[in-house]
Amino acid sequence: MSSLLNSLLPEYFKPKTNLNINSSRVQYGFNARIDMQYEDDSGTRKGSRPNAFMSNTVAFIGNYEGIIVDDIPILDGLRADIFDTHGDLDMGLVEDALSKSTMIRRNVPTYTAYASELLYKRNLTSLFYNMLRLYYIKKWGSIKYEKDAIFYDNGHACLLNRQLFPKSRDASLESSLSLPEAEIAMLDPGLEFPEEDVPAILWHGRVSSRATCILGQACSEFAPLAPFSIAHYSPQLTRKLFVNAPAGIEPSSGRYTHEDVKDAITILVSANQAYTDFEAAYLMLAQTLVSPVPRTAEASAWFINAGMVNMPTLSCANGYYPALTNVNPYHRLDTWKDTLNHWVAYPDMLFYHSVAMIESCYVELGNVARVSDSDAINKYTFTELSVQGRPVMNRGIIVDLTLVAMRTGREISLPYPVSCGLTRTDALLQGTEIHVPVVVKDIDMPQYYNAIDKDVIEGQETVIKVKQLPPAMYPIYTYGINTTEFYSDHFEDQVQVEMAPIDNGKAVFNDARKFSKFMSIMRMMGNDVTATDLVTGRKVSNWADNSSGRFLYTDVKYEGQTAFLVDMDTVKARDHCWVSIVDPNGTMNLSYKMTNFRAAMFSRNKPLYMTGGSVRTIATGNYRDAAERLRAMDETLRLKPFKITEKLDFSCSSLRDTKFVGQQYAILTPSGTTTDIRSGRGTNQSYRRGRTSTGYRIGVEDDEDLDIGTVKYIVPLYLNGDNVAQNCLEATHVLIKACSIANRIVDDGEGHCFTQQGLAQQWIFHRGEMIFVKAVRIGQLNAYYVDYKNVTNYSLKTAAQVGATISNNLRHGFVDNQQDAYTRLVANYSDTRKWIRDNFTYNYNMEKEKYRITQYHHTHVRLKDLFPSRKIVKLEGYEALLAMMLDRFNNIESTHVTFFTYLRALPDREKEVFISLVLNYNGLGREWLKSEGVRAKQAQGTVKYDMSKLFELNVLENGVDEEVDWEKEKRNRSDIKTVNISYAKVLEHCRELFIMARAEGKRPMRMKWQEYWRQRAVIMPGGSVHSQHPVEQDVIRVLPREIRSKKGVASVMPYKEQKYFTSRRPEIHAYTSTKYEWGKVRALYGCDFSSHTMADFGLLQCEDTFPGFVPTGSYANEDYVRTRIAGTHSLIPFCYDFDDFNSQHSKEAMQAVIDAWISVYHDKLTDDQIEAAKWTRNSVDRMVAHQPNTGETYDVKGTLFSGWRLTTFFNTALNYCYLANAGINSLVPTSLHNGDDVFAGIRTIADGISLIKNAAATGVRANTTKMNIGTIAEFLRVDMRAKNSTGSQYLTRGIATFTHSRVESDAPLTLRNLVSAYKTRYDEILARGASIDNMKPLYRKQLFFARKLFNVEKDIVDNLITMDISCGGLQEKGRVSEMVLQEVDIENIDSYRKTRMIAKLIDKGVGDYTAFLKTNFSEIADAITRETRVESVTKAYNVKKKTVVRAFRDLSAAYHERAVRHAWKGMSGLHIVNRIRMGVSNLVMVVSKINPAKANVLAKSGDPTKWLAVLT
C-alpha cells in the first residue's frame, strides 16, 4: 500500500526525511511558471508569473469521533498450514497444530473451540491505530490549538474554531490528552482458558517500562480537550491486555518519546506477524492525520458534524496460542511487510500520504456530490459498484480507496474487505440542510451567502444554510490527472467572453464551468472579480472563497439553472497584477499555460523543509505484480471504476412498399465505399454528374463509380411505421446504418462482434451507443432505421447523424462502417494534390478590377503585398491552382486577395480539405461556398478536422458587385405572406412572456419626457437620419456630414415638448439603402426621426424587459448565454432557423406585442411614456417605404423594417410567440430566443420534428438546411459547446476583415486607432488558428502603411505595439522605458474651423444637458460648465487628425504609473465622476465632495485629469 500512496505524489515532488511541524496548519502545493495572455478587439496583453503558487491548506484539527465496531478478521500472520486450499481456516488443522504444542497439555478440543471463536475475530488494527496516533502526538506535540482562532476567513465571513468545536479548550497537541492506562498484564502460563474479552498479544523479549506505558495508553479512552484530528475521541479498546513476553514486563514509567512508540510498534507487529493489521491502521491514520481547511465557507459543512471513525474491536488470541502464529505465516500479499518497513524508514511520509489521500477523496467527493441521485452511479452506489469480488459495507477506508481509484483512474486491490476507518460520506448522505455558524466581517456578507439573517452588523454571529456540499479541496498533488472543467486543473486552458458595446461592460455567464474558468484565469492574472448570481441574487468573488489562482462556483449543480453577471468596470487589479484588464472590448480571450513545477510547503507563512536523505520508494512494478496475483484470488477485494458492457444481436425484416414521392433516398453499395444522397419524385429522374438537390457526391467522378460492388441499391432515408417511404416530416423512422449480408459477422466498431439473426426490432451498437432499431432487408443490405422517439439525449452521436440527415447536410456514410466523408474526400484527391504541389504552375495576371465601392482606406492587403510587383507572376502549387480558379470566378482584387490570404492562413490539415473541395467542384462557386460552409457546421465535432476553419466560406468573396432587386423587395412587402396567428393568440403569448420577465424583476426604464429630451445630446444614437417632415428635412439638409445623424439633429434642435412629436400622424417612413456585406448585398430600411424618438422613449430599454431565457439588450452576450445553456449540455442541441424572419410579421401581430408590453408594464411607466408607446403602436398601421434610387414610394402592408428602433424587440417577442404557439414549452425543456435566433435543447429528435411541423402548420417559414441539430450549439454566432471557444469562431470572417474593412467604415483619423485596429485584426486571426509565419509579413506591411500615411518613423509604430499603456503604448504589461508616446493634433485649419462650427451647432442640446446635470448632481453643480461640456460632447464628432510623438520622463515615473494603475477602481462614487469628469472645470473639487483624501492626492499630482484616469 505504501507504493500506491507514494504513487499519488506528483513526479516533481521529491520527499525527504525529518519533517518538523510546529503549526496546526500546513499549506502545500507547487510553484510553476504561468504564461498568460489576454486578447480583445483592442489588442493583446501578455504576462508571466515565474513563481506562481498553487496550493491547498490542511490542518491538524478535525471533527472526528471513534466508535468500536465489529469488523472482519485479518488472518494474515497465522501459520499457513492451518488454512485449506480455498484460503479458509480449517479447525481440524487448528486442532492438529494445537495438539503438537508443548503449552497445550490437555483438553485440546476445548482449546480448539476457544481458538476458533477468537481467530474469527482476530483484528489488531485499532491497537496499531492508537499507537500510531501516540507516535505523532509525541513527535509534533507542540502544535497549538486556540479556540478563538479563525478556522476559515474570506473577508466576508469567518468561522472560529469555537464555533466548529463548541466544547474545545486552548491546548497543545500533547497537553490536550491526559491518557489513563489500561492494565497491561503478563500472561500466566498456567491460565487454563482465555479470559473473556481480554486479548493476548505476543512480545519479543522484555516489555520495557516505556512500552508498558505506551500499550496501556493505546488501549485506553482518548478524551481530548482540543479537537486535534489524531487526538480525536475514541473509546477504551480493552480494560486489560495480556502480553505473552518471555522476559517479563516492567511497570509503566508514565513517560516515553515518539521513538519509543516506533520501537514498540515494530516489536508488536513482528512478534504477532500483524503486518496487514498495521497497514490497515496506517490507512486509517492517513485518513485522519490532517483535515482540509475548506475552500469556501459552505465547504465547512463537511466538518460541522463529527465524522465517525470505525475502530475494529480489539481481538487477538496470539498470546494464548503462540503455536498458531510463528510458523510459516499465511499472507495474501507478498508485499505485506512493505508498509511497516517503509514507515519505519520514513515515518514522516505518512503526512504526505495523508494529504494525497484526503485530496483525492475530497476532490472526487466534489464530483460525487453533483451527481443526481437518479443516475446509475451516485453517492449511494459508487462504492458498491466499484467493488469487484464480494459485497462490502459502504464505510471506512474502502470508500476512501474507491474515491482514490476514481480520482486516479487506477485499479486498487486489498487483501480484506475491511470496513474500518473514517466514513467521509456521512455528511453527503444525510441529505438535509446543514447550518454553518459564522461571524460577520462585512455587512454585505448576505449578498454572498445564503445567510439566515439578511441584515447583519460586523462581528455578529449568524448561520449560513448549505444544501449542496461544495468541494473542500482542489487538485494539487493530483493536478493534471483526469482533468475537468469543474476544477480548472488543466496545464493550459482558455476562455472566451463576448463583450459587445451594448453590454456596457457587463458580462453574463450561463455556464458555471465557463464562469469558474473565467474567474480562475482572472485570478491567475492578478485581478479581483466580483460577480452576481442572477438566480439567487448572491454575489461571489474570485478572491474571497478561493486561492491559488483557481475559482470554483459550487452552490449549484451543473444541471441547475445558473446565471452570473460580472461588471467588468469593477474588476480590480491587485498590487501584484500580471495582466490587467482595461476597458474590455468585443471578444475577450483569456488563456494560460503552466510549466516548470516545483513542490513547496509553508507553515506559519514560512517555508517548511524536509532534510536528510531522499525517500526510496518501493518500485511500482512490485505493486503491479502483486495486484496481478490478487486478481486471481477470489477472496481479494478489487476496487475499480464501474463499467457496463452488454452484447446484443442484429436483425432484419423486409421492405413492404417503396413510394418515392418527394422523399429523400440514398444510393448504397454493399462495399460501402460511396454514399450518394438524393431527393426526387422517382427512380428514373436524371441528375447532373456529381451533383444533387441536397448535396454533392464527394470524390465521385461519374455515376458508374458507384458500382464498386456488383449492384447498387436505392434506399429510402425515411420510413413510416408501415415501412413506406415518406419525407422527413411525415416519417417516423430514419436510416442510420446499413450492413452487407455477405458479412456474416458484424463488427460494431468497438471490438464486439455479433451474428445477424433476423429479428425485425432489435438493439444495435452504433457509433458507440446502444440504439433500438428496426431492420429492413434491401437486396444484399440490411438497412437499420431508428424511430425519431428513440434518438434521445442518451444517444448524442446518433442524434448528430440524424440531425445532419434531416437538415440535408449529410456528411456521413451508412454502409459497413464507412469513413466520414471529409476523410474520404481528402483521401480521394491525395494523388491529385501531390501532383499539384510538385508540378502545377500558373501565370497569374496581377491587374484586377477594384471593388466598385472600395476606397483607399478599406484595403489592408493588396496583391502586391502577397506577390512580386509585376504584371504577370508565375505561381506554383496550391496558390497556382487557386489563382486559376479565381480567374474563372471573378476579376475583383479584393476577392482574390482574401482567398489567397485565407489559403496562407489555413493550418495544413484544413488546407487539404479546402483544396480537395475546390478540386471536387472543379472551381469556385458562390453556391457551393455557401452550402459547404453550412455543412461544415453540421460536421463540426463529428470528424477529425477542425471544421470551424471552413465555416461561412462564402464571406471570402468579400464584395459582391451587384445591386439589391428593388422590385422583388417591393413585391415582398406588398404581396405579403405572414404567419397565420390571430391577434388574440399573439397578445396571450406575449403577455405570458412579459409576465415571466416581471416576475424575475425585469423593469423598463421610467423617465419623464423632459428628462429624456434634455439628455438627447448624449443618449441619441449616431445612425443615419431621415424625416418626412420639412422642419427636420431642412435641418438635415444643411448639417455637415460629420453630424448628419440622429444625435446631430437632436443636438441642433431646441427644446421640444412631447406634443411636438405626438401631434404628428402616427406613421413609420423607411428609406432604403444598400448594405454591402461579405459575399452578398441586402436592403436596409432606415426609419424616420419621429418614429425612432417615440419608439425609443415610449419603450425605453425594452430589450431588457424579457425573461432570462430571452437574452437581449444587456444580456445578449456570450457569457450570459453560456450560463443559460449550461443546463442543456445533456440534451440534443437544436438550432431552429427562421427564413427571412422580418417578412413574416403582420401588422396585427406587431401591434399585439406593444399592447401586451404596455398592459404588463404600464404601472412602471410615466404617462409620457405610455402616450409615446401608444403612438408607436398606432404608427404600425401606416408604414411607407421610400426608394431614393428610383424615386418610388409605396405603402407597406406588413413585415418589419430592418432599421427601425424596435426591430430586435419585435423579432424576439414574435420569435417566442410563434414557437410557443407551436408547443415549444411542452416539447422542449429549455430554449433561448434572440431576434431570429433560437437555441433549444431537445430530449428526442421526435420533439424537434414536432416543433418544425407545428410551426409550419401556422405558416412559419423555416430553413431546415441552416438548422444545426445534434452537433454545434450555435446561438448568437457562437458555438456554445466548442471545447476551444476561440476556435469555434470563424477564420473566414477574420480573414475578410484583415484584408478589407467594412465598406461603411470611415478613413482613419488617428495613428493610434489605425495601428490598434491592425493589431486587433491580426491578433484575432491568430486566435482563430491562422498561421503566424504566413500572416506576420502581411501585418508588418500594414504597419508600414500606417507609418507612411502619418509620416512617422518606424520606431514610433514599433513602440506603439510593444510599449506599456503607461508609456502611451497599446500593450498591457508591455515594455516600460523613459520614452512616453503622446497623441497630438495634426495642425489643420479646416479641422479647427469644423470643430468650432460643430460646437456652435450643437450648443442647444449641450445647454439642455448641462442644465440636466446641474439639476441631478446639485452637490457639484458649481463644477459643471457649459464650456467643458461642449468640449466633451464635441469629441463624439471626431474631425481632428492625430499622430503620435515621443516625449521623455524619468523611468521610475513610468514604473510608478503602471504600479498604481486602477488603484482607485473600487472608489465609491466613481460612477458620478465618470459621468461628468469631462465636463467640469475643477475636477479636484468634484472628487473632494466624494473623497477628500483622494482629492488631496490629485491636487498634489500636478495633472489631476491624467492621474484620475490612471488611478481609476
Curated annotation (Swiss-Prot):
Q: Name one GO molecular function term.
A: nucleotide binding
Q: Which domain of life is it from?
A: Viruses
List the InterPro entries: DNA/RNA_pol_sf, Major_coat_LA-virus, Major_coat_LA-virus_sf, RNA-dir_pol_luteovirus
GO BP annotations of the record are: DNA-templated transcription; viral translational frameshifting
What keywords would UniProt list here? Hydrolase, Nucleotide-binding, Nucleotidyltransferase, RNA-binding, RNA-directed RNA polymerase, Transferase, Viral RNA replication
Q: Which reaction does it catalyse?
A: RNA(n) + a ribonucleoside 5'-triphosphate = RNA(n+1) + diphosphate
Entry EC no(s): 2.7.7.48
Q: What does this protein do?
A: RNA-dependent RNA polymerase which replicates the viral genome. Catalyzes the transcription of fully conservative plus-strand genomic RNAs that are extruded from the virion into the cytoplasm where they function as mRNAs for translation of viral proteins and also as substrates for encapsidation to form new virions. Once encapsidated, the positive strand is converted to dsRNA by the RNA-directed RNA polymerase.
- Give the family, as the similarity comment puts it: Belongs to the totiviridae RNA-directed RNA polymerase family.
Q: What else is known?
A: One molecule or two of Gag capsid protein is replaced in the virion by Gag-Pol because the fusion protein is essential for RNA encapsidation and replication.
- Please give the name of this protein: Probable RNA-directed RNA polymerase
Q: Which organism is it from?
A: Saccharomyces cerevisiae virus L-BC
